[in-house]
Regions:
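Amphipathic, low-complexity, repeat-rich surface-exposed segments
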Residues: 1-173
Length: 173
C-alpha cells in the first residue's frame, strides 16, 4: 500500500510539478526579473533590519510591513509589542509578498497554469506562516507554558484521531 501511495504521489496527477517546471523555465529565461525581485526583497529586508534595530534600542520605528486588513493571524498584541515577534511577523510578510509578486509577474504562462501556480503558492506561503509553529507563535507559546504543554498533547491526540479516521492518511476536508 505504501508503494502505491508513493507511486501516486510521483505521478503528478494534478499537474502541480508540471506547472512549476513551466514557471521556473520561464523565470530562468528572464534573469532580469529574478535579479530585480531579489534586489527588491533584499532592500525591504534591510529596511526591516534597520527598523528593528531602532525599535530594539527604544527609538520610534514605523513598521516596514503590516498584515492585510482582516488578517486575523497576527491579532495578538505580542506580534507588535515584542521586538522578536514583530521582526518574525514582518520578515514573513515581506517574504510572502515578494514571493507571490515575483511568481505572479512571470510572463508567458497560460491562464490555467498561472492560476494553478498562484493557488499553490498561496498554500505554500500560508503553510509557512509563523503563526503555524509553536516557537514562532506567541499565543501558542503562552498557552503551552500556562497549560504545561497540555495544549500540544491535545493537538497531537486530535491528529492521531484524524489519522485513525482516515485509515492512516490525513484527509483534510
Amino acid at each position: 500500500k505504501q508503494a502505491e501511495s508513493m507511486s501516486a504521489a510521483l505521478r503528478d496527477e494534478m499537474g502541480i510539478a508540471k506547472a512549476f517546471m513551466d514557471l521556473y523555465s520561464r523565470m530562468a529565461a528572464d534573469p532580469a526579473l529574478l535579479a530585480s525581485a531579489t534586489m527588491n526583497l533584499w532592500m525591504e529586508q534591510a529596511q526591516l533590519w534597520q527598523s528593528s534595530w531602532m525599535k530594539m534600542l527604544g527609538m520610534p520605528a514605523a513598521p516596514v510591513a503590516e498584515p492585510a486588513k482582516g488578517d486575523w493571524r497576527f491579532k495578538d498584541e505580542e506580534w507588535s509589542k515584542s521586538f522578536l515577534f514583530d521582526y518574525i511577523k514582518q520578515s514573513y510578510l515581506i517574504a510572502a509578498k515578494h514571493l507571490h509578486a515575483t511568481l505572479g509577474h512571470v510572463a508567458g504562462l497560460d491562464e490555467h497554469t498561472a492560476r494553478k501556480v498562484d493557488f499553490y503558492t498561496r498554500q505554500y506561503i500560508d503553510a509557512l506562516a509563523p503563526t503555524n509553529f509553536v516557537l514562532t507563535n506567541p499565543e501558542v507559546l503562552r498557552e503551552t507554558i500556562a497549560s504545561s504543554g497540555q495544549n500540544l498533547l491535545k493537538g497531537f491526540n486530535n491528529l492521531l484521531d484524524d489519522l485513525a479516521r482516515g485509515g492512516g492518511e490525513l484527509r483534510v476536508s
